[in-house]
């Protein structure tokens, strides 16, 4: 029988949520006021990733940030991260009971209705909806959702979970994404590939959270 008790809660609105692939980016962005962030490193063994995970968690604690570790849930549990983010394929192998018992928050990626229903049944801390627009930062097996589909999913959830929109969201697309009622916007290249990442981050913080960096 599936344990339907909820995972540890997080803020209803997570605000700006950068997803980055290095400890260097974690430190830069926490240093300019970002409060929710995800370390997404790929194609490394747990042994190879552990040092980065430890350093990222330490930075999250230092800056009192909501730091999520993508995929490496065993390391996140071992080193007491704030939270873990899992894709649908990760849900097949992760020990969700161990993550919950450790008190970690859980975020889950979804791409269409069936995956959204699966996420709701798990009762995670937040649900990510995407990808909204075409993106080059990750190979995606599904088509972009678009704003109409995002709006429908937000309405279907009826505020039961914090929500995060992700995928191809540039600065100029932020107002339209926020208008759907989503509680957070995850970005990758809008910051990491910006000509001036500091300015891009400050602009995004003001647009999404209404505060200065």
Swiss-Prot record:
Per the record, the domain of life is Bacteria
| GO MF term list | magnesium ion binding; thiamine-phosphate diphosphorylase activity
Q: Which family does it belong to?
A: Belongs to the thiamine-phosphate synthase family.
What species is given as this protein's source?
Pectobacterium atrosepticum (strain SCRI 1043 / ATCC BAA-672)
| Binding site residues for 2-[(2R,5Z)-2-carboxy-4-methylthiazol-5(2H)-ylidene]ethyl phosphate | 135-137, 168, 188-189
Provide the E.C. number(s) assigned to this enzyme: 2.5.1.3
Keywords (alphabetical) are:
Magnesium, Metal-binding, Thiamine biosynthesis, Transferase
Write down any Gene Ontology CC term: cytoplasm
- What gene does the UniProt entry assign to this protein? thiE
Any keyword Ion transport?
no
Question: Which reaction is the catalytic activity of this chain?
Answer: 2-[(2R,5Z)-2-carboxy-4-methylthiazol-5(2H)-ylidene]ethyl phosphate + 4-amino-2-methyl-5-(diphosphooxymethyl)pyrimidine + 2 H(+) = thiamine phosphate + CO2 + diphosphate; 2-(2-carboxy-4-methylthiazol-5-yl)ethyl phosphate + 4-amino-2-methyl-5-(diphosphooxymethyl)pyrimidine + 2 H(+) = thiamine phosphate + CO2 + diphosphate; 4-methyl-5-(2-phosphooxyethyl)-thiazole + 4-amino-2-methyl-5-(diphosphooxymethyl)pyrimidine + H(+) = thiamine phosphate + diphosphate
Pathway assigned in UniProt: Cofactor biosynthesis; thiamine diphosphate biosynthesis; thiamine phosphate from 4-amino-2-methyl-5-diphosphomethylpyrimidine and 4-methyl-5-(2-phosphoethyl)-thiazole: step 1/1
Pfam families in UniProt: TMP-TENI
- The identity of this protein, by name, is Thiamine-phosphate synthase
Details of cofactor binding: Binds 1 Mg(2+) ion per subunit.
Q: Return the HAMAP family for the record.
A: TMP_synthase
Protein task: Condenses 4-methyl-5-(beta-hydroxyethyl)thiazole monophosphate (THZ-P) and 2-methyl-4-amino-5-hydroxymethyl pyrimidine pyrophosphate (HMP-PP) to form thiamine monophosphate (TMP).
Which residues hold 4-amino-2-methyl-5-(diphosphooxymethyl)pyrimidine? 38-42, 70, 109, 138
């Amino acid at each position: 029988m599936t344990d339907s008790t909820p995972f540890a809660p997080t803020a209803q609105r997570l605000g700006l949520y950068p997803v980055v692939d290095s400890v260097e980016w974690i430190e830069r962005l926490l240093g300019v006021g970002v409060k929710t962030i995800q370390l997404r490193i790929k194609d490394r063994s747990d042994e190879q990733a552990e040092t980065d995970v430890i350093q990222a968690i330490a930075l999250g604690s230092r800056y009192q940030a909501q730091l999520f570790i993508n995929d490496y849930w065993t390391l996140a549990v071992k080193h007491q991260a704030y939270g873990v983010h899992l894709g649908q394929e990760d849900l097949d192998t992760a020990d969700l009971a161990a993550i919950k018992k450790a008190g970690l928050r859980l975020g889950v990626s979804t791409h269409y209705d069936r995956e959204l229903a699966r996420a709701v049944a798990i009762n995670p801390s937040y649900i990510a909806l995407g990808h909204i627009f075409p993106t080059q930062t990750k190979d995606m097996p599904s088509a972009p959702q678009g704003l109409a589909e995002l709006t429908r999913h937000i309405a279907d959830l009826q505020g039961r979970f914090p929500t995060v929109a992700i995928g191809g969201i540039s600065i100029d697309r932020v107002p339209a994404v926020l208008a759907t009622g989503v509680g957070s916007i995850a970005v990758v290249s809008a910051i990491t590939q910006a000509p001036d990442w500091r300015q891009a981050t400050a602009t995004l913080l003001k647009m999404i959270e209404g505060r200065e960096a």
